[in-house]
């Protein structure tokens, strides 16, 4: 069986409320463990609408048919009213996710705020954002938070240095090909990074592939991934509007000898055996703006 890390990003209030229970049910049906990364503070995702003035973001929203994919309540959340507090209302669901045998980690305190402002936040502001998220998630699951995944893959050396203060066992903050140990600005080695290696639904549908062909597309991408494959889905997509498609993907994967697993399962016992690399800002296909991307030391 080919192991593929399954990362589930939970970005919004409705995605937590509706998408997570749906995903828990389908994962139990197929006997799969995954890694859930929760946004836990205010749902302000509607504030992304100003980005429609940026051509790449507008094109992404149009080709993915965002209104149908996500729903207007998600697209407008936190615009004309304060964003709902996610962990405050769904802490028990986050704990139930952990009790169901899945990894549970921090995605963000304020997902929209992180994506929009992380590049300009001071070290103190970055630390406060991570601390707020950890406090809320830890209160919800009643256990230490041991892993994290930066919202929108918006992470660079500054972010990694701040996260090092919180002693995560691993982070999944970037796009890349295989797990590695990141070099930090002070020359030390940070907590292991497990990059996402495969495209997400919204990155390729409407440009590279039609919705009805997506499962075959991603199965083929997994088959040709020669690194350590990691696939990201979203509670707001595969747990809601594309739930049936995701269920069918899990059936196809099993038939082709693909076993999805939690990200922590991909790591070797000896973490020192992993190569050292860097996380750098770079443009990424299907995404607007910069993302954190894995880079070899000699390329950075």
Swiss-Prot record:
Pathway(s) where this gene product acts: Glycolipid biosynthesis; 4-amino-4-deoxy-alpha-L-arabinose undecaprenyl phosphate biosynthesis; 4-amino-4-deoxy-alpha-L-arabinose undecaprenyl phosphate from UDP-4-deoxy-4-formamido-beta-L-arabinose and undecaprenyl phosphate: step 2/2; Bacterial outer membrane biogenesis; lipopolysaccharide biosynthesis
PROSITE patterns registered for this protein in UniProt: NODB (PS51677)
Residues of the NodB homology domain: 2-261
CDD domains xref list: CE4_ArnD
Cystines in this chain: none
Reaction it catalyzes: 4-deoxy-4-formamido-alpha-L-arabinopyranosyl di-trans,octa-cis-undecaprenyl phosphate + H2O = 4-amino-4-deoxy-alpha-L-arabinopyranosyl di-trans,octa-cis-undecaprenyl phosphate + formate
EC number, UniProt record: 3.5.1.n3
GO cellular component, one term: membrane
One GO MF term attached to the UniProt entry: hydrolase activity, acting on carbon-nitrogen (but not peptide) bonds, in linear amides
Keywords tagged on the record: Antibiotic resistance, Hydrolase, Lipid A biosynthesis, Lipid biosynthesis, Lipid metabolism, Lipopolysaccharide biosynthesis
One BP term from GO: response to antibiotic
PANTHER family (UniProt xref): 4-DEOXY-4-FORMAMIDO-L-ARABINOSE-PHOSPHOUNDECAPRENOL DEFORMYLASE ARND-RELATED, GLYCOSYL TRANSFERASE-RELATED
UniProt function note: Catalyzes the deformylation of 4-deoxy-4-formamido-L-arabinose-phosphoundecaprenol to 4-amino-4-deoxy-L-arabinose-phosphoundecaprenol. The modified arabinose is attached to lipid A and is required for resistance to polymyxin and cationic antimicrobial peptides.
Family: Belongs to the polysaccharide deacetylase family. ArnD deformylase subfamily.
Protein's recorded name: Probable 4-deoxy-4-formamido-L-arabinose-phosphoundecaprenol deformylase ArnD
Organism of derivation: Yersinia enterocolitica serotype O:8 / biotype 1B (strain NCTC 13174 / 8081)
Lineage, top ranks: Bacteria, Pseudomonadati, Pseudomonadota, Gammaproteobacteria, Enterobacterales
């Amino acid at each position: 069986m080919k192991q593929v890390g399954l990362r589930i990003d939970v970005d919004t209030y409705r995605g937590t409320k509706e998408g997570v229970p749906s995903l828990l049910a389908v994962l139990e049906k197929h006997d799969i463990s995954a890694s859930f990364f929760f946004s836990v503070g205010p749902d302000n995702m509607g504030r992304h609408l100003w980005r429609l003035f940026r051509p790449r973001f507008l094109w992404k929203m149009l080709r993915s048919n965002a209104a149908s994919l996500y729903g207007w309540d998600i697209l407008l959340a936190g615009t004309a009213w304060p964003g709902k507090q996610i962990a405050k209302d769904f802490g028990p669901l986050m704990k139930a996710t952990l009790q169901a045998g899945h990894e549970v980690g921090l995605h963000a305190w304020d997902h929209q705020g992180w994506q929009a402002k992380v590049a300009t936040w001071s070290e103190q502001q970055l630390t406060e954002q991570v601390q707020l998220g950890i406090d809320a998630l830890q209160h919800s699951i009643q256990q230490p938070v041991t892993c994290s995944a930066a919202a929108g893959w918006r992470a660079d050396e500054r972010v990694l240095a701040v996260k090092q203060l919180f002693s995560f066992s691993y982070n999944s903050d970037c796009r890349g090909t295989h797990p590695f140990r990141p070099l930090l600005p002070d020359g030390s080695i940070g907590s292991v990074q497990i990059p996402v290696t495969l495209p997400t639904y919204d990155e390729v549908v409407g440009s590279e592939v039609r919705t009805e062909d997506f499962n075959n597309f991603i199965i083929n991408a997994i088959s040709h991934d020669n690194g350590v494959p990691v696939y990201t889905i979203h509670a707001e997509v595969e747990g809601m509007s594309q739930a049936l498609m995701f269920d069918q993907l899990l059936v196809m994967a099993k038939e082709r000898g693909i076993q999805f697993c939690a990200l922590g399962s991909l790591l070797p016992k000896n973490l020192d055996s992993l190569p050292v690399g860097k996380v750098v800002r770079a443009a990424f296909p299907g995404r607007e703006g910069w993302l954190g991307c894995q880079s070899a030391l000699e390329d950075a």
